[in-house]
Amino acid sequence: MEALRQRIETAFENRQHITPGTVEPSLRADVETVIAMLDKGEARVAEKINGQWQVHQWLKKAVLLSFRIFDNGVIDGGDTKYFDKVPQKFADYDEARFKAEAIRVVPPATVRKGSFIGKNTVLMPSYVNLGAYVDEGTMVDTWATVGSCAQIGKNVHLSGGVGIGGVLEPLQAGPTIIEDNCFIGARSEIVEGVVVEEGSVISMGVYIGQSTRIFDRETGEVHYGRVPAGSVVVSGNLPSACGKYSLYAAIIVKKVDAKTRAKVGINELLRIVD
């Protein structure tokens, strides 16, 4: 693995000279190996080690190299055709393989090769980009988007129209991460490498990037780039220092533990008690 990493790092430094016509066969094979590892979940762009998220930048670089190495080709989409560099993940699946992996895919859900989909997941008509990791028991609802290299935990619900940002366009340092047992409400956007920690509930229409103030109304703390574990978050605003206007903010209205979350419905958690 270390030798593979070093070869990818070296190639990435010289990427401006790489094209589908000039790429060395050995580099093509290396990138294909990485894409296959990501596709099977044998490697992931970020993983939690000793309680901290570690980003494996070289895997992200391999994904970026793939766009320089592979040429566009025709992809059969049944009633239509597509022309792209990245094949579809399920292009060679049959009934037995879908059953073995316990994945339900509702048309016209699109999942690019190089993304991992865990067991007992449900993909409604949605989009999962390459390098993404979607863990087991997760629901990706209609028109939700899981961006490149995003990390989605176990038993997560991404509601209709949710956008989870990617790292490739524009290039970001770290992927957006939704930890286990989170609920992301309809049409919310979590982007720019924000981490939503375990057991959090995000209401409908909440937008969080690295510059978004995440205000805890109980403690007065302001967080950036991280939603603390067990937070219940709604959209709101905070007054300016001069008091003449207010600016958008995400508001933590309460904290819940796993026991409370198991007993109480999502809608009940989102009711604000003044």
Swiss-Prot record:
Its main location: cytoplasm. It holds the Pfam family THDPS_N_2. The keyword Cytoplasm applies. It catalyses: (S)-2,3,4,5-tetrahydrodipicolinate + succinyl-CoA + H2O = (S)-2-succinylamino-6-oxoheptanedioate + CoA. The keyword Cytoplasm applies. Its EC number is 2.3.1.117. GO terms for biological process: diaminopimelate biosynthetic process; lysine biosynthetic process via diaminopimelate. It is an enzyme of class 2 (transferase). Belongs to the transferase hexapeptide repeat family. Homotrimer. This is 2,3,4,5-tetrahydropyridine-2,6-dicarboxylate N-succinyltransferase.
